[in-house]
Amino acid sequence: MAEKTADETKSNSAGETKSNGSVPRVVLVTGASRFLGGYLVRRLAQNPDIERVIAVDSVSPSKDMLRRMGRAEFVRADIRNPLIGKVVRGAEVDTVVHASTLQRAPKSGSRAAMKDMNVIGAMQLFAVCQKAPTVRKVVLRSASVVYGCSAKDPVKFTEEMSARRRPPGGYARDSLEIEGYLRGMGRRRPDISVGILRLAPLIGPQLTATVGHYVSAPVVPTIVGRDARLQLLHVEDALAALECATVSSVAGTYNIAADGVVMMSQAIRRAGRIQVPMPLALFRSAGSALVGSSMRLYTDEQLEYFRFGCGLDTTRMRTEMGFSPRWTTMQALDDFVRATQTRRIIGSSWIDRAEQTLTAIVGGNAVSSPGSQNADVLSMPDTGSGVVER
């Protein structure tokens, strides 16, 4: 893979797709040093119908990621800098995939710095696309976070719906602004095809994302009286959806999510962890005592997702975009648990037997299973921590 400066630059998909035969010639992908952007560059570079793939980011990817990108060209450039225009015009880019939106403020920065990188960067990039005569398509990686999370949410959000209340997090507000600026560019340049993909929370064996990290804690704090509905998206399906939007002629806004939902309690149980319900007022403080400093890393919008969850209507994704995810939500979760080889604190078979026993007791028929109480309760070695095998 060749790494270039701005001055030097003049599918076997996981999901099933219906290609419309509109393969681009030169594709530029932002956010290439991150997981999703980097692996998308890799997939596009493997497409022989695409002449050039240009990966852009303000920091260089790891050596391993550079190697994975193959024939793609890396350009170290900040999309807030006017030099990005020189890259687009010099390479005669016809398709731009914007996948560099930050979900949290950088370690050395503030919320203002995050907004500057997200919103101002997107405005600058879209302005360049609007002025470039060769650009014919812009694809935005957005997120379902734009719908927010609340007790008043519908069972499933369609693309026409909006949040029931203003999202509390900066990532959601930035995503809404970025979507608005992209639609505005599309109105001013109707010859440019605009695609917005609102991805459900990602999970996968190669990615330490929010939900996977949360349910991997030995003890998982939850809120009394709440059991969030989780609709996830396997990272391979996310990459396949972005590739589909890039190489086909589809345009518009699409919810991208796997089939089905998993309740938070069910996800914790399938991961073999222990759920500890607590009042909302103690959720962050008591949660920090249980899981340590990692609790403080979650944003307000992520904590609200753990409380309420969010369901997405994917009818348009299937009928208009022609994309069908390979993994269901349950399968994506199980793939993460299996691949990360998480040590189970409570065996799932023991939980199944306990549920059957309780059901029988409630029904008036106590079930006795000699010799089963001590089987498969703990797959962790006994460390004398006081955990009883029951």
Task: Set out the residue ranges of the language-model regions.
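Active-site Tyr-X1-5-Lys
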Residues: R166-G195
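N-terminal Rossmann NAD(P)H-binding glycine-rich loop of SDR-like oxidoreductase domains
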Residues: V26-N47
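Glycine-rich NAD(P)-binding loop of the Rossmann-fold in SDR/ketoreductase-type enzymes
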Residues: A113-Q124, R173-D174, L233
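Glycine/proline-rich active-site loop of Rossmann-fold NAD(P)-dependent oxidoreductases
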Residues: L176, P190-I192, I203-H213, C244-N255, ...
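Conserved Rossmann-fold NAD(P)-dependent oxidoreductase catalytic core, especially the SDR/UDP-sugar
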Residues: M123-G170
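NAD(P)H-binding glycine-rich loop region in Rossmannoid oxidoreductase-like domains
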Residues: E73-I120, C149
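NAD(P)-dependent short-chain dehydrogenase/reductase
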Residues: K152-D153, G184-Q231, V235
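Mid/C-terminal beta-alpha module of Rossmann-like enzyme folds, strongest
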Residues: L239-E301, T314, D334, R343, ...
